[in-house]
Amino acid sequence: MQNLGIQILFQGNNFLRLWVGLWVSLKLAVISMFFSICLGMLFGMVMTSTNKLVRFFCRLYLETVRIMPQLVLLFLVYFGAAKHLNVNLSGGTAAVLVFTFWGTAEMGDLVRSALESIPVHQYQSGYALGFGKIGVYRHIIIPQTIRRLLPSMMNLLTRMVKTTSLVVLIGVIEVVKVGKQIIDASRYTVPDAALWVYGVIFIMYFAVCYPFSRAAALLDKKLRD
Amino acid sequence: MNVEEILKTEQLNKSYENGLKVLNDITFSLKKGEVVVIIGPSGCGKSTFLRCLNMLEPVDSGTIRFKDRVIDRANKDVYELRQKIGMVFQSYDLFPHLTILDNILLAPVKVQKRERSEVAKEAEDLLKRVGLSDKTNVYPRQLSGGQKQRVAIVRALMMHPEILLLDEITAALDPEMVREVLQVVLELAREGMTMVIVTHEMEFARAVADRVLFMDQGVVVEEGSPEEFFNSPQTERAKQFLNMFHYEAR
Amino acid sequence: MKKGLLSALLGITMAAGLLAGCSQAKAPAGAPAQEASPSAKARSLDEIKKAGTIRIGVFSDKNPFGYVDSNGKIQGYDVYFGKRIAKDLFGSEDKVEFVYVEAASRVEYLKSAKVDVILANFTVTNERKEQVDFALPYMKVALGVVSPDKALISDVSQLKDKTLIVVKGTTAETYFSQNHPEIKLLKFDEYQEAYDALADGRGDAFSTDNTEVLAWAIQNKGFTVGIESIGNLDTIAPAVQKGNTELLEWLNGEIKSLAGEQFFHQDYKETLEPVYGDEIDPENLVVEGGQV
């Protein structure tokens, strides 16, 4: 009897397990993104500093993060912290730490370039109207920066969602791992399960990420008009 | 004749990092209600001078006095003083993320903490006067250059400044839009607004100015009433400069 | 080389990492203070008993040794043993927390004391013995040779001057090229390519771990594993952190005492036989009492 691959999805609670796995991925990405945005805003402002030493350390941080594979960072924080510092972090906490560490650097660089792309006249008009430095940033520069940042922020978030598939290596079971478990559990009975399971994961990713990028596009359009 | 002196500079000096002297011992005074036009070739220091008056740029030495107060850029009251000295720039410097009304209301509400409904009414009156009452809820990018500059003037006026600094506000405009902006400035002058204007529009300068300052290489070369200056300039440099605006028929 | 890089970068990363997210960095209470050492101190047998549960690292996608069934429950040969450990330690087979590990990080899980025992199809090698302590084996693997029923290879001498398919980098490749130069080898990068080649008749037989070919032959009619065990015998054993002697000795005692009831034969019947069928001899895989 021919066993159809798609049946595997409806065995037991496989389908639900996939959604739970996706929820784990999303949760990690969204929490990390939240911290990355907050810290990245500050880091981006620090990056525009004219102090050469400050700029050097910002650059060093950014380049370090870019050179180091996220996997190495995950291992360092998850296993390294336990071995060397006796800090036993859960896989989820370690993942949020690493993704925030990475996201803050990337976000900071985006914020820096957005800040630098705002003409100097915008600052001067603000000062000429009697605003102080904080007021100029709060009412004039940051609102404009956020608008410019929206597309690249969305991009970073989706990259983060995709990168969450690495966290399985520190024991966090997310959607791709659940998929592998389902495929493997039935590898003797349903050899072509992989195609179906990965296909469904693809659609699930799309179903979740598409509204995000759609919302960002709409918001961007609304802000432009 | 007892006219109040409102702004005064003494021996302002400023050099760029490369050593180029951009302001050289400028001593200047402005009376209440007076309109002073500063003209001169590009790079003569006139825009820098204007920005120093508003403390957007520091000076190397010299003092700036607003009424009886000496202005120090490092001092906190600089933010308060800037509200009394409004400024409009050459480039369209409206805030692109805010509607016209919000552009105008931002500083009065956030800086001066005035009631939004009260300032909104004032803003609408002013917009009506400059012929833009139908534009309150649109965004800057939907306006022409001339319309944007009129809004920028309204935005500066909303702070109730005692002096208005206009830095080549028509230099980036298409010729057909220059007039609509300058007309607004002429009206302000008629109403007694104290202004320091940097411009390349000679006809306008002649019409609006109480006094003309001619600057070259960081120095005030010549000073006088518009009639004196435009009809019989005293210095060779001023004559040469004015000749550039003059074309002989063949 | 890689380890040096990791240690060198650790300082920077941790400092910056903690800085970047210090709000969430909560050091768990009760982590005993101790001097810096290359590994975190594993829980002793007493500490595990006091805690009331044991943490065992298993695979979650290596059917039939450790896998998650369609109801989300962990199953398999290793898991079956893990539950028995919990039962004999605490009186209940639910007193075990299974941690899902990956092949590449099994050693790290022990070194960082995130698990007490690894039961993840962990093959005993000399290299690994330097990093972890292995208890007595509970399973053994060798190579198997699968071939078509029409021209079944049941002895290695039949392979002379014939073509044997192997996957690059496996023990099968090493074994046959060193010990049987008379056999022609056809090498592939991927298992799937190798199986396809066998099905197409590009080779006379295919060899890799016997557990792998046995399971494949069950699902593919017309093919049989004619040689179920050949080559060097590898053993599979539980592993604990290096120096965790009490726990190691307890595990050894457990494995010895389970021989009396032939526990691993029972384990085989429950978890492996459904996959391998009843035609093969369990003695080729199962080890009782640590006696290979």
Report residues per predicted region.
Chain B
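C-terminal boundary and immediately downstream tail of ABC-type ATPase nucleotide-binding domains
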Residues: 227-250
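ABC family nucleotide-binding domain
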Residues: 3-226
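Short, Lys/Arg-enriched, disordered terminal segments
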Residues: 1-4, 250
